[in-house]
Regions:
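Conserved donor NDP-sugar-binding/catalytic core segment of glycosyltransferases
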Residues: 121-157, 379-412
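Short, acidic, metal-binding catalytic loop of nucleotide-sugar glycosyltransferases
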Residues: 32-44, 304-315
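A recurrent flexible, glycine/aromatic-enriched loop bordering the glycosyltransferase active site
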Residues: 169-194, 406-414, 426-442
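A conserved acidic beta->alpha catalytic loop
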Residues: 33, 51-60, 81, 322-329
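A conserved hydrophobic helix/loop-capping motif in glycosyltransferases and polysaccharide synthases
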Residues: 12-26, 30, 37-38, 49-51, ...
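Terminal low-complexity segments of carbohydrate-biosynthetic enzymes
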Residues: 256-287, 293, 298-311, 328-331, ...
């Protein structure tokens, strides 16, 4: 529990808010930089450090550094423990109250972050801008210690900045002669932003949000017609870390782009001879599962394409679960099963995910590869190498999804990826938004992981396996491979609706919990087409992890 704050100093001109959660390692540099501000006396500003459910010595570390600067007024506040946005709001509300008590509407409410170091003139430049009439100010944010980022990440950030800058300039009204340029850069972030107390009151304060509160603050300013000045003279350097304290923000963006750069592969980079060497060195066994469906578009062609891999010894077995009423493919060395004979205690096969689950039960390989025989492709061996390559070359990878090199064409899983899966992922699981085709039916994984995951019996498995794998081993253990073009299989619109329903059901169970799903009790899918009204019961139940049986 923090002590009550003393009254503000009569000459107070600015309050600096610093939200912090477990920042013991970095907060010292932040406070040190704030203590050494030029062009302003220590009596004219104060620092409000908002401790947001810290479990380390963040507060003590900050106080220790502040003690080396006797004139610095550092006050500790308790945040609600609900994220950086809520903590920042606590600090801003306190700052507004303190400046208002002095009847100082022109006083500055400034914000930075505990992992950020401001320049020596950071405050004085902003106060000078406010004295000229600026109501809101965004600082320029640079990355420090970014040498460890994967190649291309810093370039991506710079390119995004240039695009944002052009968009910003297109929306700005021309400034009058002699007026300063309002947008010398594009940023307005919690790491460096400021607004006057009067402006804070005018927009109704900072919205209570766990993250991205700075973006919503910018929108609030725009709605009120409050111009934001973005001078390059206001600068800070923030951490280039990939694990942040907020659910959204710079660290998450850097982590996502770093993952895309580091964990996206191309099937052309993996040759048979090299993978054979990797397999022999690791003594890893490999199974391929080809779940046949009601219509056999390309099973025999796929089996023929895989012969070269089985003869070479890269693939140890090919497992083909077939529906009772479907065609029974020629062997070609494959182990062909009636899928009802696999795990018969669970009754008849209920759908796509159920077939995957039963195929996995018959596969003995330490790595299991799932290919889609319904999409005819004479390059299935090439695609198999692309999915197996990352798992054979990097032991820390556990799960790999494939994607086509061509853009989505509105067919099949590509359409569902764009219309259903991608919005869901970006909304609830943004760390996975780098997957190009999150619903791809071509994937590979280590059996130990796959056997620990539940399988929705229907098409929901296409997304649930990705979500569950990320939850179990982390996104760093997941990868994707560009497999090259593959013809999409047309899917009737009604079938896409059923698939979307199954995907949404599986995603809801993982996003909001099984209890929420049970309370909602998924019912039939109603289909009002051509003046008719019918219902279809979509299979949404789940098979238990094989490792639990």
């Amino acid at each position: 529990m923090t002590a009550p704050l003393p009254p503000p100093h009569p000459t107070l001109r600015a309050c600096v808010i610093v939200p912090a959660r477990d920042e013991e390692a970095l907060v010292g540099s932040c406070i040190e930089a704030l203590a050494e501000q030029d062009g302003i006396s220590l009596e004219e500003y104060e620092v409000l450090l908002v401790l947001d459910r810290c479990t380390d010595a963040t507060g003590n570390r900050a106080l220790k550094v502040a003690a080396q600067h006797p004139g610095l007024r550092l006050h500790l506040l308790e945040g609600p423990g609900r994220g950086a946005g809520h903590a920042r709001r606590v600090g801003m509300e306190e700052a507004y109250a303190r400046l208002s008590s002095l009847e100082r509407p022109e006083g500055l409410i400034a914000s930075t972050d505990a992992d950020t170091v401001v320049t020596p003139n950071w405050l004085s430049v902003q106060l000078a801008a406010a004295a000229r009439g600026a109501k809101a100010i965004g600082g320029h944010i640079e990355l420090r210690d970014d040498a460890g980022l994967p190649r291309g990440v810093s370039g991506w950030r710079a390119e995004q900045g240039r695009l944002r800058q052009r968009e910003l300039h297109a929306t700005l009204e021309p400034t009058g002669e002699g007026e300063p340029m309002r947008a010398e850069h594009w940023q307005f972030s919690g790491a460096s932003l400021a607004l006057t107390a009067a402006t804070y009151k005018e927009i109704g304060g900072l919205e209570p949000r766990a993250a991205l509160e700075d973006e919503y603050l910018e929108l609030a300013l725009l709605r009120r017609g409050v111009p934001i000045e973005r001078p390059l003279a206001v600068r800070v350097a923030t951490s280039a870390r990939l694990v942040g304290r907020a659910s959204r923000g710079l660290a998450r963006d850097l982590a996502l782009v770093s993952w895309v750069r580091s964990n996206t592969y191309d099937a052309r980079d993996f040759g048979l001879d090299d993978l054979m060497s990797k397999k022999h060195a690791s003594k890893t066994s490999i199974s391929v599962v080809l779940p046949a469906r009601q219509k056999d578009h390309g099973m025999d062609a796929t089996l023929d394409a895989l012969v070269s891999l089985t003869k070479a010894g890269l693939v140890d077995e090919v497992v083909v679960p077939c529906p009772e009423s479907g065609p029974f493919p020629a062997g070609n060395g494959a182990k062909v099963y009636r899928d009802a004979d696999l795990m018969p205690g669970f009754g008849p096969v209920r759908g796509y995910g159920d077939a995957l689950w039963r195929g996995l039960s018959a596969a003995g390989g330490e790595i299991v590869l799932f290919l889609d025989p319904d999409a005819p492709d004479d390059r299935q061996a090439h695609r198999a190498l692309g999915l197996l390559g990352p798992l054979l070359c990097w032991e820390d990878l556990r799960f790999v999804k494939g994607f086509s090199a061509e853009p989505a064409d509105g067919q099949g899983s590509q359409a569902l990826s764009e219309l259903m899966a991608r919005p869901l992922i970006n909304l609830y699981h943004p760390e996975l938004s780098g997957f190009v085709e999150p619903l791809s039916s071509e994937f590979a994984g280590r059996r130990a992981l796959l056997a620990s995951l539940p399988f929705p019996v229907g098409y929901g498995a296409s997304l649930s396996l990705l979500l569950d794998a990320a939850q179990t081993v982390g996104v760093h253990a997941l990868a994707q491979t560009r497999l090259g073009p593959c013809p999409a299989t047309p899917v009737p619109l009604a079938d896409l609706g059923e698939a979307a329903y199954a995907i949404l059901t599986a995603a809801t169970a993982r996003t909001h919990g099984d209890k929420d799903l049970d309370d909602r009790a998924p019912g039939p899918l109603f289909l009002p087409f051509d003046g008719r009204f019918k219902s279809h019961r979509v299979a949404v139940e789940e098979r238990p992890p094989l490792g639990s049986l």
